């Protein structure tokens, strides 16, 4: 395998993926497989931080439509991301990989508070930093949190793990004529309205000149392959 393109990255994982075939909650086999993928990438000498969504457990936007305030709903969603990070941290540790959960909300009995210094220390010491609770503020998605944290810790790129191998002009599962893009600029991604990440995340990535690499997590070895320039992915940069 070729030398990795980046030495420090942030991997953005969807909470929905953690549900596995059951569509809700945490599927342990899926968690273990993701842990294995991250450990394999870490073995290449890459420093890895991770942001996970919480949609497999709770979605604040959906509950706010049923009468709960958006602020409360988003806060509940942040707690779901903490659950996912704790589950992944335990899976990583069980396989011998040091991992540390750092949350944007204070909950000292559960995990440590996120600071850039704590995250960078974890990475330098060979651990995987799991960054929970989004930005710690309502109205911001975990995609935006991923770009923000990546910029803060000096990551070379955000790896956006999805269930398809890049950005398409339409949902390839619904439209057989959907066009797959090898590369897009941040502005093109914003103008195209592609649903792979929200507009705020793309705009922040453009402002900070941070590449976003969109790939399929379903393929074994996909993280390492993408980081070595061998995997199928769409690069959003420039």
Curated annotation (Swiss-Prot):
General function of this protein: Catalyzes the reversible phosphorylation of UMP to UDP.
Main location: cytoplasm
Keyword terms, alphabetized: ATP-binding, Cytoplasm, Kinase, Nucleotide-binding, Pyrimidine biosynthesis, Transferase
GO BP terms in the entry: 'de novo' CTP biosynthetic process; UDP biosynthetic process
InterPro entries cross-referenced by the UniProt entry: AceGlu_kinase-like_sf (IPR036393), Asp/Glu/Uridylate_kinase (IPR001048), Uridylate_kinase (IPR011817), Uridylate_kinase_bac (IPR015963)
Enzyme nomenclature, EC number: 2.7.4.22
Transmembrane segments: none
Subcellular location: Cytoplasm
Catalytic reactions of this protein: UMP + ATP = UDP + ADP
Similarity field: Belongs to the UMP kinase family.
Pathway(s) it belongs to: Pyrimidine metabolism; CTP biosynthesis via de novo pathway; UDP from UMP (UMPK route): step 1/1
GO CC annotation terms, alphabetical: cytosol
Cross-referenced Pfam families: AA_kinase
Residues where UMP binds: 54, 74, 135-142
Name of this protein: Uridylate kinase
Activity regulation: Inhibited by UTP.
A GO molecular function held by the record: ATP binding
Amino-acid positions noted as binding ATP in the UniProt annotation, renumbered to this chain: 12-15, 55, 59, 162-163, 168, 171
Assembly and oligomerization: Homohexamer.
């Amino acid at each position: 395998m070729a030398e990795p393109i980046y030495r420090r990255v942030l991997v953005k994982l969807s909470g929905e993926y953690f549900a596995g075939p059951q569509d809700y909650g945490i599927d342990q086999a899926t968690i273990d497989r993701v842990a294995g993928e991250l450990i394999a990438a870490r073995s290449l000498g890459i420093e890895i931080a991770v942001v996970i969504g919480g949609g497999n457990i709770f979605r604040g936007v959906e509950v706010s439509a049923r009468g709960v305030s958006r602020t409360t709903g988003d806060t509940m969603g942040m707690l779901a991301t903490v659950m996912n990070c704790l589950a992944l941290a335990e899976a990583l540790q069980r396989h011998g990989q040091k991992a540390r959960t750092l949350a944007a909300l204070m909950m000292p009995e559960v995990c440590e508070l996120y600071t850039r210094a704590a995250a960078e220390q974890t990475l330098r010491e060979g651990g995987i930093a799991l960054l929970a609770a989004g930005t710690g503020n309502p109205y911001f998605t975990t995609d935006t949190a991923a770009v923000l944290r990546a910029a803060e810790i000096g990551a070379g790129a955000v790896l956006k793990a999805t269930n398809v191998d890049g950005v398409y002009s339409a949902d390839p599962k619904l439209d057989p004529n959907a066009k797959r893009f090898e590369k897009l600029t941040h502005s093109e991604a914003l103008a195209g309205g592609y649903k792979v990440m929200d507009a705020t995340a793309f705009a922040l990535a453009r402002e900070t000149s941070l590449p976003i690499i969109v790939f399929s997590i379903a393929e074994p070895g996909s993280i390492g392959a993408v980081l070595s320039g061998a995997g199928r992915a769409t690069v959003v940069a420039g």
